[in-house]
Curated annotation (Swiss-Prot):
Coiled coil: none
Subunit structure, as described in the record: Homodimer.
UniProt function note: Binds and inhibits cysteine proteinases. Inhibits most strongly papain and cathepsin L, more weakly bromelain and cathepsin B while it is completely ineffective against cathepsin H.
Gene name tied to this protein: clt4
Keywords of the record: Protease inhibitor, Thiol protease inhibitor
Protein name per the record: Clitocypin-4/-3
Gene3D superfamilies: 2.80.10.50
Organism this protein belongs to: Clitocybe nebularis (Clouded agaric)
Length: 152
């Protein structure tokens, strides 16, 4: 499995069945510290709030930190609770597993490294919020949320 290089990226919401849906789309967008991370178009006023520093840690997991201007302190993808449809929060950066989607070079499933009996906890979109979704660990459960990582 290929690992993602450390760097700054924009994260576009896609799916495992349609990893390259064409122009447009929604991108992970910070609203502010301790606020839910949103999925917004890559246009003003959102564009400047869609840059993320992705760093691989020694254990092979990643942190996804907001890389925008004038951030008063470091925050990134985080959570208060890992329940079905709970929001991804811009908070103290947590670690995640990035799983490359087969037949792609830049599309990954973002999973929380939390053990839940029989399920994977993955980052998806509901409405215009990034949320945690549960999927069976056996790969069943249909189309999964994924993210295209585009270098800045």
């Amino acid at each position: 499995m290929a690992s993602l290089e450390d760097g700054t990226y924009r994260l576009r919401a896609v799916t495992t069945s349609n990893p390259d849906p064409g122009v447009g789309g929604e991108y992970a967008t910070v609203e502010g510290a301790r606020q839910p991370v949103k999925a917004e178009p890559s246009t003003p006023p959102f564009f400047e709030r869609q840059i993320w520093q992705v760093t691989r840690n020694a254990d092979g997991q990643y942190t996804i930190k907001y890389q925008g201007l004038n951030a008063p302190f470091e925050y990134g993808f985080s959570y208060d609770q890992l329940e079905q449809n709970a929001p991804v929060i811009a908070g103290d950066p947590k670690e995640y597993i990035l799983q490359l989607v087969p037949s792609t070079t830049d599309v990954y499933i973002i999973r929380a490294p939390i053990q839940r009996v029989g399920v994977d906890v993955e980052v998806g979109v509901q409405g215009n919020n990034l949320v945690y979704k549960f999927f069976p660990v056996d790969g069943s459960g249909g189309d999964r949320p994924a993210w295209r990582f585009t270098r800045e």
